[in-house]
Amino acid sequence: MTRIAIVGVAGRMGRTLVNAVQQDPEASLGGGIVEPGSSLVGADLGELAGVGRLGVNATDDPAAIADAFDVLIDFTAPRVTLANLAFCAEHGKAIVIGTTGLSDDELAELDGYRERVPMVFAPNMSVGVNLTLKLLETAARALGDEGYDIEVSEAHHRHKVDAPSGTALKMGEVVAKALSRDLKEDGVFERVGQCGPRGDKEIGFATVRAGDIVGEHTVMFATEGERIEITHKASSRMTFAKGAVRAARWVASRGNGRYDMQDVLGLKG
């Protein structure tokens, strides 16, 4: 049984994670963490999540529940995540990170913990999205540089704060790597006004923020006479939550290192 604690337990994703842990027979809820000074300190996590009283209360101090969990799940903000990563290194805990929007410096800081913490870091925990990444790699290798224009589009709810989504960027990185390209050089994130014709090696990105869209991603390979589109659509946050719990169970028995969902699902190699 893997004991799991959830950071940001009062948020939309946090409440969904509580539900996912309760549904998993191989996991148990060890605790939930809210913002320092939150009025929700002491609240029952089951009541917060709408699943009934569980007898596990929210805290704003991870150290207070350090003996109650094995793995921390964090879908919050970059600086919060890095602070929790340091906590896990100090207390011998594993961590699953679904936070997106990290800067290059923050990613480097995160990577510096790979020898100190067992961590799964992935922009998207959905099994379907991670299978989609494998499909994209296969498609890009097969098509090669045969005149296919590549465009990545994504849509999310109006509350999402980073753009493009971490999943869209990961899709672009997978395609770029398969084509021996560098996304930092070939990625195009804005086209405005007289921007000129499309470059041959461009990987374009388009973003939509509207309503309550959970998450939709499409990668288009377009050439003269045909267009291939590979799409993933999420209709519920539960798909991400279940993937995160699966990752937590997996990483609980792993040594220090930085892993991703491809490792969890056995899709590498």
Swiss-Prot record:
The active site is at residues 156, 160. Its EC number is 1.17.1.8. HAMAP family: DapB. Disulfide bonds: none annotated. It is an enzyme of class 1 (oxidoreductase). Pathway: Amino-acid biosynthesis; L-lysine biosynthesis via DAP pathway; (S)-tetrahydrodipicolinate from L-aspartate: step 4/4. It comes from Chromohalobacter salexigens (strain ATCC BAA-138 / DSM 3043 / CIP 106854 / NCIMB 13768 / 1H11). Catalyzes the conversion of 4-hydroxy-tetrahydrodipicolinate (HTPA) to tetrahydrodipicolinate. NAD(+) binds at residues 8-13, 98-100, 122-125. This is 4-hydroxy-tetrahydrodipicolinate reductase. It catalyses: (S)-2,3,4,5-tetrahydrodipicolinate + NAD(+) + H2O = (2S,4S)-4-hydroxy-2,3,4,5-tetrahydrodipicolinate + NADH + H(+); (S)-2,3,4,5-tetrahydrodipicolinate + NADP(+) + H2O = (2S,4S)-4-hydroxy-2,3,4,5-tetrahydrodipicolinate + NADPH + H(+). Its main location: cytoplasm. Pfam families: DapB_C (PF05173), DapB_N (PF01113). GO terms for biological process: diaminopimelate biosynthetic process; lysine biosynthetic process via diaminopimelate. GO terms for molecular function: 4-hydroxy-tetrahydrodipicolinate reductase; NAD binding; NADP binding; oxidoreductase activity, acting on CH or CH2 groups, NAD or NADP as acceptor. It is found in: Cytoplasm. GO terms for cellular component: cytosol. Belongs to the DapB family. (S)-2,3,4,5-tetrahydrodipicolinate binds at residues 157, 166-167. Signal peptide: none annotated. Keywords: Amino-acid biosynthesis, Cytoplasm, Diaminopimelate biosynthesis, Lysine biosynthesis, NAD, NADP, Oxidoreductase. InterPro entries: DapB_C, DapB_N, DapB_N_CS, DHDPR_bac, NAD(P)-bd_dom_sf.
